[in-house]
Amino acid sequence: GFSTFMSYYMLSALADAGKTAEALSMLKTYYGGMLKAGATTFWEDFDIDWLKDGAALDSLSGEYDIHGDNGAHCYIGYRHSLCHGWSSAPAAFLAERVLGIRLLEPGCRRIGIYPELGGLEWAEGEYPTPYGTVSVKCRKTGDGKISVEYKAPEQIEIETGSGVSM
């Protein structure tokens, strides 16, 4: 099974094992399942099996209520949280692993950019720091490398890894 609470560690363990593409596939299936059920935020608890006969959040069909009839970490019928910090793993995983933004010393003075695109062709995002926003755009090139463009405040030193072209 998959757990919203443990998902960051599960996804990171896959990436550590060189399986970033598999981690992204799991992320798309699991968190994408919430989106298919009508989520606009990520939930405290979720099980893919709930989608089989469950009604979308914005419908009143005869199907069971995904929101009210489930939840391993709440009282059934009392509804679990539909916007919960346990489900924040995708934001950290995508920033740290896919975009590869790593803090190399306290205070954000040195940041490394070591993207792991997995099966993606490109990724882009922003990372807030005390000195301003670091913006990163990564794209796979024909020679198997990753092209990286970034913008960072002048107070921040950026380091990139091997296999990355600027």
Give the location of each predicted region.
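Non-catalytic C-terminal accessory modules of carbohydrate-active enzymes
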Residues: 21-166
